């Protein structure tokens, strides 16, 4: 595990402890059960594929540790509508505040503005956060293999599935495959950003493709132009999680159109 990831996870542990003190586990479960019905994240992706279209998971992200502030003029509902108009399959919304300037309010605002399913993009380290995601209205959660042990991955996935949510499992390299072997989610993402160097290479996705046969593979990070999209499609990857490229655009809807 890298220094930056260790730092983020340590902060997250403190954050979750404070959240549990404010809203106990029993109450967050009740809120999750009372949340608006789930929109199927995986079905939305498969719907695009059935039409022979790429499935875009369009990200709403204000900032990141590596790039700092990405989009000063940040209006989640407006961004969500632009993504929906452009034909995105799903949304991804950052809810981590210390490192990504995210917020649960951004997730709620985005989801209320559109009919698309929404992923809570955060560092999940406790099953409490899975219930919390559903309580906030999320339809899917991200589980990062590098941040979790096998038992945690399996337990958090089970909770998410019990709540009707889709799990996007995120891998960085082949060393993480073994602890994920029992997971049943069909949606496996590969983050092209090296956690140690922060360098980005689409080879990360390509190197893992043989091991992910039969999965719906999502390529994450590093897609900056139409050539990248066409290259990944030529290799059999048809699902893309893209944030920064869209967030830096003056006209988000037009930028999505340029790539897809």
UniProtKB/Swiss-Prot annotation:
GO MF, one annotated term: indole-3-glycerol-phosphate synthase activity
The keyword Zinc appears for this protein: no
Keyword Nucleotidyltransferase: no
Keywords per UniProt: Amino-acid biosynthesis, Aromatic amino acid biosynthesis, Decarboxylase, Lyase, Tryptophan biosynthesis
Pfam families, per database record: IGPS
InterPro entries linked to this entry: Aldolase_TIM, Indole-3-glycerol_P_synth, Indole-3-glycerol_P_synth_dom, Indole-3-GlycerolPSynthase_CS, RibuloseP-bd_barrel
GO process annotations (BP): L-tryptophan biosynthetic process
EC class name: lyase
E.C. no: 4.1.1.48
PROSITE patterns listed in its UniProt record: IGPS
Family in the record: Belongs to the TrpC family.
Protein's UniProt name: Indole-3-glycerol phosphate synthase
UniProt organism field: Neisseria meningitidis serogroup B (strain ATCC BAA-335 / MC58)
Origin organism lineage: Bacteria, Pseudomonadati, Pseudomonadota, Betaproteobacteria, Neisseriales
Gene from which the chain derives: trpC
């Amino acid at each position: 595990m890298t220094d930056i990831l260790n730092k983020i996870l340590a902060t997250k542990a403190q954050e979750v402890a404070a959240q549990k003190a404010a809203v106990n586990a029993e109450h967050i479960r009740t809120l999750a059960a009372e949340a608006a019905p789930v929109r199927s994240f995986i079905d939305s992706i498969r719907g695009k594929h059935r039409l022979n279209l790429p499935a875009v998971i369009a990200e709403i992200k204000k900032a990141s540790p590596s790039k700092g502030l990405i989009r000063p003029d940040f209006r989640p509902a407006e961004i969500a509508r632009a993504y929906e108009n452009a034909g995105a399959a799903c949304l991804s919304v950052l809810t981590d505040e210390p490192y990504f300037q995210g917020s649960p309010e951004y997730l709620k605002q985005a989801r209320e503005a559109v009919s698309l399913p929404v992923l809570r993009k955060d560092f999940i380290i406790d099953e409490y956060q899975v219930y919390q995601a559903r309580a906030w209205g999320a339809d899917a959660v991200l589980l990062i293999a590098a941040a979790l042990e096998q038992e945690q991955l399996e337990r958090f996935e089970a909770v998410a599935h019990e709540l009707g949510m889709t799990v996007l499992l995120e891998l960085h390299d082949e060393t993480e495959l073994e602890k994920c072997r029992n997971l049943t989610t069909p949606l496996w993402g590969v983050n092209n950003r090296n956690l140690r160097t922060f360098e980005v290479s689409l080879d990360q996705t390509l190197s893992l493709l043989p091991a992910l046969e039969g999965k719906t593979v999502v390529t994450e990070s590093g897609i900056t132009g139409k050539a990248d999209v066409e290259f990944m499609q030529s290799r059999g990857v048809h699902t893309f999680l893209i944030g920064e490229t869209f967030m830096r655009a003056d006209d988000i809807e037009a930028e999505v159109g340029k790539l897809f």
